[in-house]
């Protein structure tokens, strides 16, 4: 899979799956020419009939409920593995969006593409199995996505920060919060690079508690962050304590710092 396309955007149509999600919404703005399909008009868990063969597929449709996958792994498998298999069967080069949660968090320096995956959770396992369905294209691992639509940490903190004086947020997990707008731009740049696994995540890293505090500071909200442990939070799915991503590959697109992404996102939200 270590090769590239002369010009995947040069002919034919680009298909975006999962266009109703936060990443899909960002991809729609960068790939204006795309046939952007939401779950309502393209269910990837069933064999796909488009009526045309796309020149490129940006596969953003996925099961993203990390905790829900622990109790319903079959549904997560259906979306993240079987769905990816059906999309790959279209025969077009594919960009598959994977996750930092394919790693176990045992390292204390950024994970690079050559590191061996070892997922802790059902969600992480399904994303890794989805990677293995890709025969032609790019596997993009990113981290802690947030954007102006959908359910994500930044939007949740904005709401809680306006409602409360204090929030309790996990401080023993560290990652690279990545703005979907920046990831979409980097994805377009990636199309001129060889196929294979690429780590595309924001520059810098922080804890969830750090990110919450930054949201409140940037948005001018008077809300205190009380750091807690993952154990205290008591979520069903295990999560890596450290899942910062960096690319070791020559010519890897560079994303802006996570704080810059946060400012852009908050401006988009009018916060």
Residue ranges and their predicted role:
Residues 4-32:
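N-terminal Rossmann NAD(P)H-binding glycine-rich loop of SDR-like oxidoreductase domains
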Residues 32-49:
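Adenosine-cofactor binding site in Rossmann-like domains, unifying the SAM/SAH pocket
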Residues 48, 207-213, 228-271:
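Conserved C-terminal active-site "lid" loop/helix of NAD(P)H-dependent oxidoreductases
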Residues 48-79:
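NAD(P)H-binding glycine-rich loop region in Rossmannoid oxidoreductase-like domains
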Residues 71, 78-83, 102-140, 144-147:
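Catalytic helix-loop patch of NAD(P)-dependent Rossmann-fold dehydrogenases
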Residues 186, 192-236:
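Mid/C-terminal beta-alpha module of Rossmann-like enzyme folds, strongest
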């Amino acid at each position: 899979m270590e090769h590239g396309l002369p010009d995947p955007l040069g002919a034919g149509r680009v298909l975006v799956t999962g266009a109703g999600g936060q990443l899909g919404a960002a991809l729609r703005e960068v790939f204006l020419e795309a046939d952007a399909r939401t779950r309502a008009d393209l269910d990837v868990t069933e064999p796909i009939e488009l009526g045309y063969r796309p020149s490129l597929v940006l596969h953003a449709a996925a099961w993203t409920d990390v905790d829900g996958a622990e109790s319903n792994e079959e549904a997560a498998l259906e979306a993240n593995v079987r769905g990816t298999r059906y999309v790959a069967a279209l025969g077009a080069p594919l960009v598959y969006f994977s996750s930092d949660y394919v790693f176990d968090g045992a390292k204390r320096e950024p994970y690079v593409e050559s590191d061996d995956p070892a997922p802790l959770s059902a969600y992480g396992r399904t994303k890794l199995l989805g990677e293995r369905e890709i025969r032609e294209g790019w596997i993009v691992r990113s981290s802690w996505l947030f954007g102006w639509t959908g359910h994500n940490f930044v939007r949740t903190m904005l709401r809680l920060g306006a409602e409360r004086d204090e929030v309790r947020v996990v401080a023993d997990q560290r990652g690279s919060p990545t703005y979907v707008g920046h990831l979409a731009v980097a994805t377009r740049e990636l199309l001129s690079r060889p196929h294979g696994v690429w780590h595309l995540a924001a520059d810098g890293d922080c804890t969830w508690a750090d990110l919450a505090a930054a949201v409140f500071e940037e948005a001018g909200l008077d809300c205190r962050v009380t750091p807690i442990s993952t154990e205290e939070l008591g979520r069903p799915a295990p999560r890596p304590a450290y899942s910062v991503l960096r690319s070791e590959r020559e010519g890897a697109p560079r994303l802006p710092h996570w704080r810059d992404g946060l400012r852009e996102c908050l401006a988009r939200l009018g916060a």
